[in-house]
Amino acid sequence: IPPRTPGLPQPGQNGDLPVNAYTLIDGKAAAARVLVQVRKDVDSLREQDIQPALAVILVGCDPASQVYVRNKILRAEEVGIRSVEHRLSPDTSTAQLLNLIATLNADRSINGILLQLPLPAHMDELRALEAIAPDKDVDGFHSQNVGGLSQGRTVLAPCTPSGCLYLLEQTCGDLRGKHAVVIGRSNM
Protein backbone atom coordinates (compact mmCIF):
# COMPACT_ATOMS: atom_id res chain seq x y z
CA ILE A 1 0.00 0.00 0.00
CA PRO A 2 1.52 3.34 -0.98
CA PRO A 3 2.04 5.80 1.88
CA ARG A 4 -0.48 8.63 2.23
CA THR A 5 0.65 12.22 2.37
CA PRO A 6 -1.42 14.35 4.75
CA GLY A 7 -3.16 17.23 2.99
CA LEU A 8 -2.90 15.76 -0.51
CA PRO A 9 -5.97 14.35 -2.24
CA GLN A 10 -5.99 10.60 -2.02
CA PRO A 11 -6.56 8.38 -5.07
CA GLY A 12 -10.23 7.81 -5.75
CA GLN A 13 -11.37 11.03 -4.06
CA ASN A 14 -13.13 13.63 -6.17
CA GLY A 15 -12.69 11.52 -9.31
CA ASP A 16 -8.91 11.41 -8.96
CA LEU A 17 -7.09 8.63 -10.75
CA PRO A 18 -5.68 5.60 -8.96
CA VAL A 19 -2.04 5.78 -7.84
CA ASN A 20 -0.59 4.11 -10.95
CA ALA A 21 -2.92 5.76 -13.48
CA TYR A 22 -1.89 8.59 -15.75
CA THR A 23 -3.47 11.02 -18.15
CA LEU A 24 -1.96 11.54 -21.56
CA ILE A 25 -2.14 15.22 -22.44
CA ASP A 26 -2.49 16.08 -26.12
CA GLY A 27 -0.32 19.18 -26.36
CA LYS A 28 -0.90 19.59 -30.10
CA ALA A 29 -4.68 19.81 -29.66
CA ALA A 30 -4.25 22.33 -26.84
CA ALA A 31 -1.83 24.38 -28.96
CA ALA A 32 -4.33 24.41 -31.82
CA ARG A 33 -7.01 25.79 -29.47
CA VAL A 34 -4.61 28.50 -28.27
CA LEU A 35 -3.71 29.46 -31.85
CA VAL A 36 -7.40 29.83 -32.75
CA GLN A 37 -7.93 32.20 -29.80
CA VAL A 38 -4.75 34.17 -30.49
CA ARG A 39 -5.82 34.57 -34.13
CA LYS A 40 -9.13 36.05 -32.92
CA ASP A 41 -7.27 38.41 -30.58
CA VAL A 42 -4.93 39.52 -33.39
CA ASP A 43 -7.89 40.07 -35.73
CA SER A 44 -9.53 42.21 -33.04
CA LEU A 45 -6.36 44.30 -32.73
CA ARG A 46 -6.15 44.71 -36.51
CA GLU A 47 -9.73 46.05 -36.53
CA GLN A 48 -8.35 48.81 -34.28
CA ASP A 49 -5.48 49.44 -36.76
CA ILE A 50 -2.95 47.73 -34.49
CA GLN A 51 -0.57 45.32 -36.24
CA PRO A 52 1.15 43.13 -33.63
CA ALA A 53 4.83 42.66 -34.43
CA LEU A 54 7.44 40.43 -32.83
CA ALA A 55 11.19 40.97 -33.14
CA VAL A 56 13.16 37.74 -32.72
CA ILE A 57 16.89 37.90 -32.03
CA LEU A 58 19.09 34.86 -32.66
CA VAL A 59 22.79 35.11 -31.88
CA GLY A 60 24.97 32.37 -33.31
CA CYS A 61 24.27 29.15 -35.20
CA ASP A 62 22.97 26.71 -32.57
CA PRO A 63 20.85 24.20 -34.56
CA ALA A 64 18.25 23.74 -31.80
CA SER A 65 17.87 27.52 -31.44
CA GLN A 66 17.43 27.87 -35.20
CA VAL A 67 14.59 25.32 -35.12
CA TYR A 68 12.93 27.06 -32.14
CA VAL A 69 13.15 30.45 -33.83
CA ARG A 70 11.81 29.12 -37.13
CA ASN A 71 8.84 27.52 -35.34
CA LYS A 72 8.10 30.65 -33.30
CA ILE A 73 8.12 32.79 -36.43
CA LEU A 74 5.88 30.34 -38.31
CA ARG A 75 3.34 30.26 -35.46
CA ALA A 76 3.38 34.05 -35.16
CA GLU A 77 2.77 34.50 -38.87
CA GLU A 78 0.09 31.79 -38.80
CA VAL A 79 -1.98 33.93 -36.42
CA GLY A 80 -1.26 37.24 -38.18
CA ILE A 81 1.61 38.56 -36.07
CA ARG A 82 4.31 40.24 -38.14
CA SER A 83 7.75 38.80 -37.39
CA VAL A 84 11.07 40.54 -37.81
CA GLU A 85 14.07 38.24 -37.45
CA HIS A 86 17.51 39.51 -36.46
CA ARG A 87 20.27 36.92 -36.94
CA LEU A 88 23.57 37.94 -35.42
CA SER A 89 26.91 36.23 -35.88
CA PRO A 90 28.34 34.18 -32.98
CA ASP A 91 31.11 36.76 -32.48
CA THR A 92 28.66 39.63 -31.91
CA SER A 93 29.61 41.59 -28.79
CA THR A 94 27.28 42.22 -25.88
CA ALA A 95 27.48 45.95 -26.72
CA GLN A 96 26.29 45.29 -30.29
CA LEU A 97 23.40 43.18 -28.99
CA LEU A 98 22.46 45.89 -26.47
CA ASN A 99 22.42 48.47 -29.28
CA LEU A 100 20.01 46.31 -31.30
CA ILE A 101 17.79 45.80 -28.25
CA ALA A 102 17.75 49.58 -27.60
CA THR A 103 16.73 50.17 -31.22
CA LEU A 104 13.91 47.61 -30.95
CA ASN A 105 12.76 49.06 -27.61
CA ALA A 106 12.42 52.47 -29.28
CA ASP A 107 10.66 51.10 -32.39
CA ARG A 108 6.94 51.74 -31.86
CA SER A 109 6.06 49.25 -34.62
CA ILE A 110 7.53 46.40 -32.54
CA ASN A 111 5.28 45.15 -29.73
CA GLY A 112 7.42 42.30 -28.45
CA ILE A 113 11.05 41.24 -28.34
CA LEU A 114 12.19 37.64 -28.03
CA LEU A 115 15.87 36.97 -27.36
CA GLN A 116 16.55 33.32 -28.15
CA LEU A 117 18.62 31.67 -25.44
CA PRO A 118 21.23 30.48 -24.83
CA LEU A 119 23.57 33.21 -25.97
CA PRO A 120 27.20 32.46 -26.85
CA ALA A 121 29.39 32.04 -23.74
CA HIS A 122 31.19 35.39 -24.16
CA MET A 123 27.93 37.39 -23.94
CA ASP A 124 26.32 38.78 -20.79
CA GLU A 125 22.92 37.06 -20.91
CA LEU A 126 21.48 38.76 -17.82
CA ARG A 127 22.48 42.20 -19.05
CA ALA A 128 20.86 41.51 -22.42
CA LEU A 129 17.62 40.27 -20.83
CA GLU A 130 17.50 43.30 -18.53
CA ALA A 131 17.96 45.61 -21.53
CA ILE A 132 14.66 44.49 -23.07
CA ALA A 133 11.84 46.86 -22.10
CA PRO A 134 9.62 45.00 -19.59
CA ASP A 135 6.49 45.71 -21.65
CA LYS A 136 8.14 44.18 -24.75
CA ASP A 137 9.68 41.19 -22.93
CA VAL A 138 7.55 38.38 -24.36
CA ASP A 139 9.46 35.70 -22.45
CA GLY A 140 8.88 37.45 -19.11
CA PHE A 141 12.55 37.22 -18.08
CA HIS A 142 13.11 40.89 -17.16
CA SER A 143 13.49 41.26 -13.38
CA GLN A 144 10.40 43.54 -13.22
CA ASN A 145 8.30 40.82 -14.86
CA VAL A 146 9.74 38.03 -12.70
CA GLY A 147 9.20 40.13 -9.56
CA GLY A 148 5.67 41.07 -10.55
CA LEU A 149 4.84 37.45 -11.24
CA SER A 150 6.14 36.36 -7.84
CA GLN A 151 3.95 39.04 -6.21
CA GLY A 152 0.84 37.94 -8.08
CA ARG A 153 0.70 41.03 -10.30
CA THR A 154 -0.39 40.72 -13.91
CA VAL A 155 2.75 40.80 -16.00
CA LEU A 156 4.15 39.13 -19.08
CA ALA A 157 4.58 35.61 -17.72
CA PRO A 158 7.14 33.18 -19.15
CA CYS A 159 5.65 31.01 -21.89
CA THR A 160 6.80 27.62 -20.58
CA PRO A 161 5.16 27.83 -17.13
CA SER A 162 2.10 29.50 -18.65
CA GLY A 163 1.82 26.63 -21.12
CA CYS A 164 2.19 24.07 -18.33
CA LEU A 165 -0.58 25.74 -16.33
CA TYR A 166 -2.82 25.89 -19.39
CA LEU A 167 -2.33 22.17 -20.07
CA LEU A 168 -3.01 21.30 -16.43
CA GLU A 169 -6.16 23.46 -16.34
CA GLN A 170 -7.41 21.93 -19.60
CA THR A 171 -6.78 18.44 -18.25
CA CYS A 172 -7.65 18.78 -14.55
CA GLY A 173 -10.03 21.72 -14.44
CA ASP A 174 -9.84 23.97 -11.38
CA LEU A 175 -6.36 23.64 -9.88
CA ARG A 176 -7.16 25.19 -6.50
CA GLY A 177 -6.20 22.77 -3.74
CA LYS A 178 -4.37 20.48 -6.15
CA HIS A 179 -0.66 19.78 -6.29
CA ALA A 180 1.43 19.38 -9.43
CA VAL A 181 5.12 18.91 -10.02
CA VAL A 182 6.88 20.17 -13.12
CA ILE A 183 10.47 19.06 -13.48
CA GLY A 184 12.92 21.07 -15.53
CA ARG A 185 16.44 22.51 -15.56
CA SER A 186 15.97 26.11 -16.65
CA ASN A 187 15.16 29.27 -14.73
CA MET A 188 11.71 29.35 -16.33
Task: Tell me the role of every PLM-derived stretch.
Residues 21, 112-180:
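Anion-binding alpha/beta catalytic cores of soluble intermediary-metabolism enzymes, centered on
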Residues 54, 76-90:
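Short beta-strand elements in bilobed, periplasmic/extracellular small-molecule ligand-binding domains
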Residues 10-13:
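Low-complexity, intrinsically disordered or signal/transmembrane-proximal segments
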Residues 59-74, 158-188:
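Glycine-rich phosphate/diphosphate-binding loop of Rossmann-like nucleotide-binding domains
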Residues 96-108:
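Short, well-structured alpha-helical segments in soluble
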Residues 51-60:
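Short beta-strand segments enriched in small/hydrophobic residues
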Residues 19-48:
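Positively charged, low-complexity intrinsically disordered leader regions
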